[in-house]
Amino acid sequence: MECEREVSEVSVPVSPSGQYLNSSVLSLSILAVLESEIPIDDSQTMSLLKNVFLPINPRFSSIMVEGKKGVKKWKRVEVKLEDHINVPRFAEGMSLEFYDKNFNDYLSKISLDQFPHNQPLWEIHIIKYPTSNAAGNVIFKLHHALGDGFSLMGALLSCLQRADNPAIPLTFPSRQSNSKKECKTTSIFKCVPKIFTRVINTVQDFGWSYMKSRFVEDDRSPIRSGEGGFRATTITTLTFSLDCVKQIKAKLKVTINDVITGIIFLGTRLYMEETSHESGKASSTALVLFNTRAIGGYKSISEMVKPNAEMPWGNRFTFLQVPIPKLANAGDAADESSSNPLRFVMKAHHLIKRKRNSAAVYLIGTMLDTLRKLRGPEATARYLHSTLKNSSLGISNLIGPVEPMTLANYPVRGLYFTVNGGPEDLSITVVSYVEKLRVAVRMDKSFIDPQKFNSCIEKAFDMIFRAAVESTSPAISSTKVSNKNKKEIKSS
């Protein structure tokens, strides 16, 4: 069955970042997994895609073609929906463990598959078999050239409704920043030194970022083989209580992002130390991705695609290269301030705040644009590939809705996403949904032990929560959460 759409003769240029992310050296895709509480009937799929998904954005009905001078453009085409829908068949009547393994193997396989060049860059995979986490799963595979996580999450949410009242829009946790008010409430004598410090930090951060991307690789370690290339991966998930994370946030007066990053940093170092004691001294860097929009919540797609939109559609992200603090017992090179687990959160807070307050992230964007104009998108893609390859870990997070939601009247039990196609051995993505934080870990299947790594992340969460809360009753609560999380670590 074809989706009847008029093919436009006008081709729209692909954004610069879209060209970087779909090149001969770098081709990134996003897997978004929606877990259903009830078994899935795929009979509504065609109508949902035709009437709801395709109209969201013309890019979902376009292919990427190369024009004059190698400039890529979006060209509208007729969409054959059956070419984009995949419903795999597994053996019937098997155990949940059997379907867990089959689902994980299938997820690993499609994460490596490339999109055909002659059709729009998206797919949907419907898994109608139960797993330990859900009665069924719907997987959206979307090429990163279509948009970043913010854009694509907004697109998916356009297909979803509130479970309690579909007429009311989904709501999201507020994200407020006082950075803009900082100098308004501070005397000019205190503000000038801060501006001077930011200038110095900008020069240092930009120079260090350039060196890390071009010349300086992280040490080889239990989380970085240094081999590059594309190998089979495995994707596992963990679930944490958002309320517990908020308790840590309130105690330390930091952001939820700082808490998440601190937990990941500590858990990663614990894994490295347990795997190889000498690796505690390894120099390791995390590539922390963040959105450059002034996010206050997701906008409707109609608002995002307007000219000069406040929060426009597309790829509007940049990265921070943040050194992962070392454990205090890792030798002379250790960061002595990290002996307390809370120091990992505070270290993440100070490093990220310092780097975000410098203009280095914007200079990096300007440099990439200049590189594209002078040497073309392929050269820019090689620079980004080198940035990923020289780092040990990628971290990205998104805000999800506060209320339970449904997809075509199917209650969504949980959701998570991963970014695939990069040369790094380890990538961690986080999304919130109904007072839960879902952490997805994509790792090299032959190099990193998934159970051990997840156990170390869980241990880091427990250590930081206990240290932050301090009193007896919350500590008991922490133990309960930790035990629950141990049951929720699944190979998804």
What are these regions (language model features)?
Residues M1-S29:
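Generic start-of-chain signal for non-secretory N-termini
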